[in-house]
A protein has these predicted regions:
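Terminal amphipathic alpha-helical/low-complexity segments used for targeting or macromolecular assembly
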Residues: 1-94, 213-220
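Structural signal for interior beta-strand "rungs" in well-ordered beta-sheet cores
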Residues: 94-210
Length: 220
């Protein structure tokens, strides 16, 4: 585990353009806590990249996993008041994984970014458990011109939602549970029901019943 910690430290420190006040005594414990928490989460994902018969996996040379670790670690650092290291961890994730996911975001357990290059996730949106997102996606507020940021409205996602490549969700959108958002779909200020596949662009969305549940990804 010491080698893994040192590898992560090397990545974060070398990526950041400024000197860091890195305290190994404090940060090693937070690293271990974060690492073990992710292993536990991954043990409940029915996917060979995330778990096997021996339990959860965290392969930090696999950039999807690196993004997950950086997000969870930065969030923990922020909670502990270690803002500079949280910023550096976020910075490392952003340049190595090409995903913009700020550590103040609220994401449920078993988050799965899948080759999520060029994806931007709204840090004020609410994301449920087993949220899965692919490349080129964008999530954010809508119609913000002339409004203060505190007036912006952000999307909410239920559990077991998958956003396929180049799909977008904006504004006062509420996405139900067990939903697949098809590639290229554009959702603006819409309420999406549970158990469906949605495609098209607002206001002309098309809905199909989801016959194979996203919940099959869950392993108890």
């Amino acid at each position: 585990m010491d080698k893994v910690y040192m590898a992560i430290k090397k990545c974060i420190v070398s990526d950041y353009p400024y000197d860091l006040d890195w305290n190994d005594e404090v940060l090693y414990k937070l690293f271990i806590d974060t690492y073990n928490a992710i292993i536990e989460e991954h043990s409940h994902i029915n996917n060979s990249y995330y778990s096997d018969d021996e339990g959860g996996k965290l392969m930090l040379n696999y950039l999807d996993h690196y993004a997950i670790f950086c997000f969870r670690f930065a969030k923990r650092l922020h909670k502990e008041g270690l803002i500079q290291i949280a910023d550096a961890t976020y910075y490392s994730m952003r340049i190595r994984c090409s995903i913009d996911l700020y550590y103040t975001s609220n994401i449920g357990e078993c988050f799965m970014p899948v080759h999520a290059l060029g994806t931007i996730m709204d840090s004020h949106a609410i994301y449920g458990r087993h949220f899965k997102i692919y490349d080129g996606c964008h999530i954010g507020p809508y119609s913000i011109v002339g409004k203060e940021p505190k007036e912006w409205v952000h999307p909410t996602f239920g559990d077991y939602v998958t956003m396929l490549a180049h799909s977008t969700v904006y504004g006062n959108s509420v996405i139900g549970n067990n939903v697949i958002i098809s590639a290229g779909t554009n959702i603006i200020n819409e309420e999406i029901p549970d158990n469906c596949i949605v495609s098209g662009s607002s206001p002309n969305l098309v809905f199909q019943k989801l016959r194979i549940s996203n919940k099959s990804i869950r392993k108890e």
